[in-house]
Swiss-Prot record:
Reactions catalysed: 6 oxidized [2Fe-2S]-[ferredoxin] + NH4(+) + 2 H2O = nitrite + 6 reduced [2Fe-2S]-[ferredoxin] + 8 H(+)
Binding site for [4Fe-4S] cluster: 411, 417, 455, 459
Described function: Catalyzes the reduction of nitrite to ammonium in the nitrate assimilation pathway, using ferredoxin as the electron donor. Can use reduced methyl viologen but neither NADPH nor NADH as electron donors.
Keyword 4Fe-4S recorded: yes
Pfam families, alphabetized: NIR_SIR, NIR_SIR_ferr
Binding annotation for siroheme: 459
Summary of temperature dependence: Optimum temperature is 60 degrees Celsius.
EC number from the UniProt entry: 1.7.7.1
Name of protein: Assimilatory ferredoxin-dependent nitrite reductase
Higher taxonomy: Archaea, Methanobacteriati, Methanobacteriota, Stenosarchaea group, Halobacteria
Gene of this entry: nasD
Listed pathway(s): Nitrogen metabolism; nitrate reduction (assimilation)
Additional notes on this entry: Enzyme stability and activity depend upon the salt concentration.
Similarity comment text for this entry: Belongs to the nitrite and sulfite reductase 4Fe-4S domain family.
């Protein structure tokens, strides 16, 4: 029997939801019948509109979609103006103030504190510059990820941007495929670093070579069924398929989308993600069914991949190649791109506006977003680099961050998310400063990946980090406090692996001390040139667990209370201020 959400979606989903949402917006939030709100909020997600957590019921988050993280000239400016004018709440965040944009791990943007009544006007402003929130959430194809510098990378093996654009304009725009069994993630990359992380996507295209009729050609291998979350992560499995041209690559991906749409589990949501579909069917059966029912050509066996060259989140030393897009890098056209490091992926509206100004002044106006919650200024001439690097904004969001900031990712947390168990972003920002000031890192280590997810859904990709953190709760001194599970040794690259969880329910004020002890042990016991991931693999998780000592330090942890019991982690009041009418934006 189909789940309740499947019944709601079968009645109404996809593009048709927009008219209903706009009608509710015109009448106001209270016009949504209380006994129907779960149903409508499930449907609103397709249009990227998410109700915020308990206690914030009249406020919404909007997630945008921009395939491959590409923001054309003027788009970031408009997004920042929307954040300034509409994304302001009744209480300031002590670290970030009010009015900001959050950069995500799928190369997109989220805006918070929006009111339903403002959504149509927000859409009008965003869509006037080509920005959309369609298909940004819910059980549908989410934002397509890829190498953020596709088409500009000096070492790109396969040009992927035209294919990405086609997936965006044809596949994701197909309303007949809007209602999937669960969310569905697509990645495409032709670069040599592996930055699209095909291993943790529902379907991923990775660059490959194959000899055909005596000639070596380039194209893509196909992997399916990867994903994180619910303590049941999966590495995507090879479908044993090679596609050499754009048309066939498109058809294979579309075929798998349609196959999963038609045969994925719609009865048990906990088993509905494609990783379980691949578990149940197996890649051989999937390949056979694609050939017999969804494609009109014979599939070629997989080619030779270049995974042994992957350096992105691969746990390899810096000398092997770039592991992210932070810093100054030459483009294939002789210009440069400059990747900034934005701590925990949160840009104030003012900073986002200034970044848009700098992109216009020194580059082409184009911005691209990475899977590590960072922006890139594109197309900077060599003669403009020094002036750009001297701008005050680049002191704050530096292209030369310390190893802790460079490697850290944090999800939304209990500030807005109903699933999270802990506050994440403000705590992580404080922790980054403490680690920077108190913990020495070996000179040849330019990045330590610390990923913090507020719950086991793992939006912060903790499973793939050097040090992964899952939000939990624990008893301490007779009180319920925020806590974390600590894992070590995850990563993607040539041989993807997930963290080993070595400590459970560590009170949050003891986590910085635990991380410090890990890094100090790493520095003391590593062999020359060894990365943290390599060190964990060599030592073994049991030995590393012995080095890890959760302990209180002078780290100030003001957000220890169980935030799930409050309406907002940083509010003194028991509930948000009441208003007689929808709150106007400043």
């Amino acid at each position: 029997m189909a789940s309740k959400k499947e019944q709601w979606k079968s009645d109404l989903y996809g593009d048709a939801v927009r008219d209903e949402l706009e009608a509710f917006a015109e009448e106001g939030f209270e016009s949504i019948p209380e006994d129907e709100r779960d149903k409508w909020f499930t449907r609103f997600k397709f249009w990227g509109v998410f109700q915020q957590r308990t206690g914030q019921e009249s406020y919404f988050m909007m997630r945008l979609t921009n395939a491959n993280g590409v923001l054309e000239p003027g788009q970031l400016r408009t997004i920042a103006e929307v954040a300034r004018d509409y994304a302001t709440g009744p209480v300031d965040n002590p670290e970030f103030g009010n009015g900001w944009v959050d950069l995500t791990t799928r190369q997109s943007i989220q805006l918070h504190w929006l009111e339903l009544e403002d959504i149509p006007e927000i859409w009008e402003q965003l869509e006037s510059v080509g920005v959309t929130s369609r298909s940004a959430g819910g059980d549908t194809m989410r934002n397509i990820t890829g190498c953020p510098v596709a088409g500009k990378d000096t070492h790109e093996l396969v040009e992927s941007k035209p294919l990405l654009d086609r997936f965006q304009s044809e596949l994701r725009e197909d309303d007949a495929l809007s209602n999937m069994p669960r969310k569905f993630n697509i990645s495409v990359t032709g670069c040599r670093e592996g930055c699209a992380q095909d291993s943790i996507n529902d379907i991923g295209l990775e660059p490959a070579r194959k000899e055909v009729d005596g000639e070596v050609i380039t194209g893509f291998n196909v992997r399916v069924g990867g994903g994180l979350g619910s303590r049941k992560p999966r590495v995507a499995r090879s479908l044993d398929v090679f596609v050499a041209d754009e048309e066939r690559a498109y058809e294979v991906v579309r075929g798998f989308v349609e196959l999963y749409h038609d045969h994925g589990n719609r009865d048990v949501r906990a088993r509905a993600r494609s990783r379980f579909f691949v578990d149940d069917w197996g890649t051989e059966k999937i390949r056979d069914r694609l050939e017999s029912e969804y494609l009109d050509f014979e599939l070629q066996s997989a080619g030779e991949d270049i995974r042994d060259e992957y350096t992105y989140n691969a746990g390899r030393p810096q000398s092997a190649g770039k592991s992210d897009h932070v810093g100054v890098h030459e483009q294939s056209d002789g210009r440069y791109y400059v990747g900034l490091s934005v701590a925990v992926g949160r840009l104030t509206a003012a900073d986002a506006l200034e970044l848009a100004d700098l992109a216009d002044k020194y580059g082409s106006g184009k911005i691209r977003l990475t899977r590590r919650q960072n922006p890139i200024v594109m197309d900077v001439p060599a003669g403009a680099l020094d002036d750009l690097l001297a701008e005050p904004l680049l002191s704050k969001h530096t292209p030369e961050p310390n190893p802790f900031q460079r490697g850290t990712v944090a999800c939304t947390g209990t500030e807005f998310c109903s699933l999270a168990l802990t506050e994440t972003k403000a705590r992580t920002a404080r922790m980054l400063r403490w680690l920077r000031d108190n913990v020495e890192v070996p000179d040849d280590v330019h990045q330590l990946k610390i990923h913090y997810s507020g719950c086991t859904a793992d939006c912060g990709q903790a499973n793939t980090a050097d040090i992964g953190l899952f939000g939990m709760r624990a008893q301490k001194d007779g009180e319920m406090v925020e806590a974390m599970d600590i894992g070590v040794g995850g990563g993607i690259g040539d041989e993807p692996s997930f963290v080993e969880w070595i400590h459970q329910r560590v009170p949050a004020d003891e986590v910085p001390g635990a991380i410090a002890s890990l890094v100090e042990a790493f520095a003391a016991h590593r062999t020359a040139g060894q990365t943290f991931r390599q060190w964990v693999e060599a030592e073994g998780p049991d030995a590393v667990a012995e080095y890890c000592e959760p302990i209180e330090t002078d780290f100030e942890a003001p957000y220890m209370h169980d935030a799930k019991q409050s309406w907002y982690p940083f509010a003194d009041e028991d509930e948000p201020p009441k208003t007689e009418q929808p709150m106007t934006s400043d």
